[in-house]
Amino acid sequence: FYWVGDGLYREKITTELEQFSNFKWLSRMKYPDEVKDFLSEIDIYALITGMDTAPLTLKEAQLMQKPVIATDVGGVNEMMENNQNGFLVKEGSSKDVIDKIKILINDKELSLKMGESGRIFVEEIFSWEIIAKKFLDSISNYIKNEK
């Protein structure tokens, strides 16, 4: 079990988890090489937060075909499809997080399917070409409506 990153709760969480021999806190990682290496090693990506609005790491994990478990806060629910490429969990529900982790650990086929689905989702929704086209369409519509 790896914990990556920092934040308001790091000290409280790491103090609690250090009692387990399979826990390792990796601190912050150098981008992009360490992040890519880390994502290639893990089986499940969990983004358990109360404050991220649209975390890039979520898309990175999906592009690496990792099933995602993420807290349903901010814009996270727009960055994935619940029960398709991962699971959204209620903020503060550790039981829900544990239940979803168990599902993915016990069902490798589902885990692989969700990982692949996440990659496809990000490529179809968040590619630079698609984002640029949507942006240009928005600007074009705005200009047309201003005349």
Model-predicted regions and their roles:
Residues K12-M29:
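Nucleotide-activated donor-binding/catalytic signature segment of Leloir-type glycosyltransferases, i.e.
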Residues K36, A54-L63, N77-E78, Q84:
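Short alpha-helical segment that forms part of, or immediately flanks, the ligand-binding pocket
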Residues D37-I42:
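Short alpha-helical donor nucleotide-sugar binding micro-motif in glycosyltransferases
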Residues D43, Q65:
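A short alpha->beta transition loop at the rim of the catalytic pocket in nucleotide-sugar-dependent
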Residues G50:
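Aromatic "clamp/platform" in nucleotide-sugar-dependent glycosyltransferases that forms part
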Residues P67-A70, M80:
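Short hydrophobic beta-strand element within catalytic cores of glycosyltransferases
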Residues D96, I103, L110-E124, I131-D137:
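A short, well-ordered alpha-helix in the C-terminal region of glycosyltransferases
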